[in-house]
């Protein structure tokens, strides 16, 4: 039986048209479609279970705002995890990854960063990766980030990405390394009749 509920804020960042909205749509609805560019921000949510913990992933898609070279800080304020996307076949989209990683670490130093290469299906069909794997690894090491490659078209690694984000967060919370981003109200013990606030995952 689930004993604990946690709200986990996730933000998606990246160059225009790398497929951020497609990732969210694939994950939350299981569907794929070539979507139009989102202006401003869009919000979606989905519940996952990690052990005895129920995690509500609140997913903020910041599509469109990257046109101004700076995302409004309010989008990722108090975020627990950030998915920084780039198109595996597009070098220009990769050049923005460092920009977003710097923005995040300066404004939310406790945030966990996931560098996600999109459109993996194109690579599997014969396209060439625009960024050498070692360069991606070096950038990930610099920001202590995780690396994923996904395809919204086939769904490959999309669910795994979000499940890993939830699991990593619960591990950090249990270890005391990221106490719900200094916001204990994110965690609610639902094992008693009166819902009592608590500071970590069970």
Curated annotation (Swiss-Prot):
Query: What Pfam families does the entry give?
Result: Ras
The alphabetized UniProt keywords are: Autophagy, Endoplasmic reticulum, Endosome, Golgi apparatus, GTP-binding, Lipoprotein, Membrane, Nucleotide-binding, Prenylation, Protein transport, Transport
Q: Which Gene3D superfamilies match?
A: P-loop containing nucleotide triphosphate hydrolases (3.40.50.300)
Q: Give any GO molecular function from the UniProt entry.
A: GTP binding
Return the motif ranges for Effector region: 35-43
Any single Gene Ontology cellular-component annotation: endomembrane system
A Gene Ontology biological process term: intracellular protein transport
What PROSITE patterns does this protein's entry cite? RAB
Q: Which SUPFAM superfamilies match?
A: P-loop containing nucleoside triphosphate hydrolases (SSF52540)
Q: Does the keyword Protein transport apply?
A: yes
Compartment(s) of residence: Endoplasmic reticulum-Golgi intermediate compartment; Endosome; Endoplasmic reticulum; Golgi apparatus
Q: Where does GTP bind?
A: 14-21, 61-65, 118-121
Keyword Transport in annotation:
yes
Q: What is this protein's function?
A: May be involved in autophagy-related processes.
Similarity comment: Belongs to the small GTPase superfamily. Rab family.
Q: What is this protein called?
A: Ras-related protein Rab-24
Q: Which gene encodes it?
A: rab24
């Amino acid at each position: 039986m689930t004993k604990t509920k946690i709200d986990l804020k996730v933000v998606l960042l990246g160059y225009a048209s790398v497929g951020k909205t497609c990732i969210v749509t694939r994950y939350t609805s299981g569907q794929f479609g070539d979507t139009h560019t989102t202006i401003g921000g869009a919000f979606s949510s989905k519940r996952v279970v990690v052990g005895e913990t129920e995690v509500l992933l609140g997913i903020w898609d910041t599509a469109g705002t990257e046109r101004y070279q700076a995302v409004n800080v309010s989008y990722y304020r108090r975020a627990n995890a950030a998915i920084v996307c780039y198109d595996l076949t597009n070098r220009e989209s990769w050049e923005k990854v460092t920009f977003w990683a710097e923005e995040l670490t300066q404004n939310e130093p406790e945030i966990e960063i996931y560098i996600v290469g999109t459109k993996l299906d194109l690579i599997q069909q014969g396209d060439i990766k625009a960024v050498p794997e070692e360069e991606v690894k070096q950038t990930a090491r610099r920001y202590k980030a995780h690396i994923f490659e996904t395809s919204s078209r086939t769904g490959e690694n999309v669910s795994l990405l979000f499940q890993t984000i939830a699991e990593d967060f619960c591990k950090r919370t249990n270890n005391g390394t990221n106490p719900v981003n200094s916001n204990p109200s994110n965690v609610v013990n639902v094992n008693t009749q009166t819902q009592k606030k608590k500071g970590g995952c069970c």
